[in-house]
């Protein structure tokens, strides 16, 4: 049999391919290695390229408990990972972020968050699969708070979430606003009663301050609040407002996620004894964390939930750490949690 002559160029190319395959296999094996002890920030950082944590001053040091569950004061938001990007009129963007966040990219996001001391992801039951895969295959320990937005309703969403490892659950904000607008206080009472049977802290989420007031008025008090707070002085904040056509009273455009300015929220929450997780503090990208985080913490937020791409986590953790290192300037509301 006549052998094919192999050129020097073919030989070098083949060798390079083998080296690349070998390197990829070694990298994959290293990334999937399972530590036998509970992973802390420094332990997880050993499994990340140094560049991923470049610029990190130190991991989060501020933690507090809600109902016995210890949370970092900065929580990773999961809207972007699930494809709910809130990008105004850029309708293509939801599909773009879903394509970006393939499972391996989600794992990377979680690994960086944990290495930076962010120990919790807050998201929808739709992400239960990838979260469980991360725990199972990557050895991750990140905690999961579920918004219970589920095809069978929020109570079934709470049950499914806890069965899949959720440490805490809360009444989805959009659904809560709609029920409050309709005066359906019994929906909150039923959710709180049924979800508390699951043995985890139970919250109520909302975008409207009126929803918080409605729940308080009807003695539907959760273990914690999920309440939006952000600036409303940006150019698109009031575009397309037509509250009469919106079931939740917020208008139909994806431009704004509150019904009042920040100060009104801060003033009301000042007297509430329940822990408050603030979300949408950046207004879905209209303000930098350097401006928004200190305002939210100083205004009374006990925790901030913020969507962060993998390349944003280090900077956002540094901003949060700087606030706590500076002596909690201007905060008057007692810390809860």
Language model regions located:
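Glycine-rich phosphate-binding active-site loops on the catalytic face of alpha/beta enzymes
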Residues: 175, 229-231, 299-313
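C-terminal helical cap(s) of enzyme catalytic domains, especially alpha/beta-barrels
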Residues: 313-333
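Catalytic alpha/beta core domains of metabolic enzymes, predominantly
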Residues: 205-293
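C-terminal segment of N-terminal export signals and the immediately downstream linker at the start
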Residues: 26-72
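N-terminal secretory signal peptides and thylakoid transit peptides that target proteins
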Residues: 2-19
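Active-site-adjacent beta->alpha loops and helix N-cap segments on the catalytic face
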Residues: 127-134, 154, 177-190, 263, ...
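Conserved, mostly hydrophobic/aromatic
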Residues: 76, 202, 276
